[in-house]
Design a protein with these regions (language model features):
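Conserved SAM/SAH-binding beta-strand->alpha-helix loop
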Residues: 42, 62
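Core SAM-dependent methyltransferase catalytic element
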Residues: 137-160
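Conserved alpha-helix/loop element of class I SAM-dependent methyltransferases that forms part
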Residues: 1-8
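Conserved SAM-binding loop
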Residues: 49-50
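A short glycine-rich, Lys/Arg-flanked "PGG" loop and its adjoining helix->strand segment in the class I
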Residues: 96-108
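Conserved beta-strand signature within the Rossmann-like core of class I S-adenosyl-L-methionine
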Residues: 108-116
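Conserved SAM-binding loop of SAM-dependent methyltransferases across substrates and taxa
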Residues: 19-31
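Conserved class I S-adenosyl-L-methionine
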Residues: 9-18
């Protein structure tokens, strides 16, 4: 999943970091801590992330209210949103709100990257005006996992 983000392109927002495995992979891939903001809703994971990554900007908040969560930092644009949220298990209105909030903070040519299980897209691409593709499959997982990359239709990639 970290391979989908180019470390020198700009600000990356991670949603639902949990214990920080993807966070660590992003840092290991060369993403500067100054270019990563982590948003975590769960209080226990938030505390764990603050302890594990004291040098990162970690915000406690709901991805469905992403603009409000980022507002105190004055952040209004990112080149990528990386999500490990279980979108497929969420009610459609919440899933839709998270995607809308993510694209509201993405630069015009920004990318929404979603890790998910199963063979199907976690987002309805045609209805949402997005172009989606499987960027990577992880066959070692059971069930197999997929990394999906979504952009607005007609935009080129800013991330690898």
């Amino acid at each position: 999943m970290a391979d989908q983000v180019s470390p020198d392109q700009g600000l990356v927002i991670e949603l639902g970091a949990g214990t920080g495995n993807v966070t660590q992979a992003l840092l290991d891939a060369g993403l500067s801590p100054d270019h990563l903001i982590v948003v975590e809703r769960d209080p226990a994971f938030y505390v764990l992330l603050k302890q594990r990554f004291p040098f990162l900007k970690i915000l406690r908040g709901d991805a469905a209210r992403l603009r409000r969560v980022l507002a105190p930092l004055g952040i209004s644009s990112a080149v990528a949103v990386v999500s490990s949220l279980p979108l497929l298990s969420m009610p459609k209105p919440i899933r839709q709100r998270i995607v809308e909030e993510s694209f509201a903070v993405l630069a015009e040519r920004g990318t929404f990257i979603q890790y998910t299980y199963g063979a199907f897209s976690p987002l309805r691409r045609r209805q949402s005006g997005l172009k989606g593709e499987v960027a990577e499959r992880v066959w070692r997982n059971f069930p197999p996992a997929a990394v999906w990359r979504f952009r607005r239709r007609g935009s080129a990639a800013h991330v690898a």
